[in-house]
């Protein structure tokens, strides 16, 4: 028996197919000539060609076996070592300024130097193993910091006031410490105070007023919160009283 097959497509559907065949994709351009005699070749825009050769394979084929490393070895080494330089630079400059760099050191001084070297090694190790994490965090912090650039003048003035208020106790501590411990106390004092000043500047720039302590305002807020909770506990209506029909 011969299968009599009649097409169910209307003339409108056939016209749409002819239009779609002759349409040109503006993004891809003209279709290249396709030789149907060669079975191994496929039209470049066919679905099978897309599956067999995805867009990412072109980059992988031309990589010649090399892996994409976003953090090369030399860059990691340079940035990690830079953190050590920034950590040690203030102390070295201060010791050079005081003309006390490796001069007349006793057991206490060498102990401090050993502790300082151990801290430098820990910082270098942390910077190396957590390179991707802390670089991304620093990048986000810098972007957020630059968005708050209008707060920089006020933050700078607050840091300046902070230095004035704490300056007199620092001088007093330096005089009390004496000649023997004066160098170490002064060095630790400078480092700690510099770190505190930088932290205050960053905090006041990102969130103005966050470093100020207003005890009365906080007490008022806590008292108001407690009073609100106290009122809500006594004014809360049980569900049974709200729905008397549920008891019935």
UniProtKB/Swiss-Prot annotation:
Q: Which InterPro entries match?
A: WTF (IPR004982)
One GO biological process from the UniProt record? meiotic drive
Record localization = Spore membrane; Vacuole membrane
Q: Which Pfam family is one of this chain's hits? A: WTF
What domain of life is recorded for the organism? Answer: Eukaryota
The record's keywords, sorted A to Z, are: Membrane, Transmembrane, Transmembrane helix, Vacuole
Asked if the record carries the keyword Coiled coil, the reply is no
- Tell whether Membrane is among the UniProt keywords: yes
Could you say which protein family the record assigns here? Answer: Belongs to the WTF family.
Q: Write down what this protein is called.
A: Meiotic drive suppressor wtf1
State the organism of origin.
Answer: Schizosaccharomyces pombe
Which gene is transcribed and translated to give this protein? wtf1
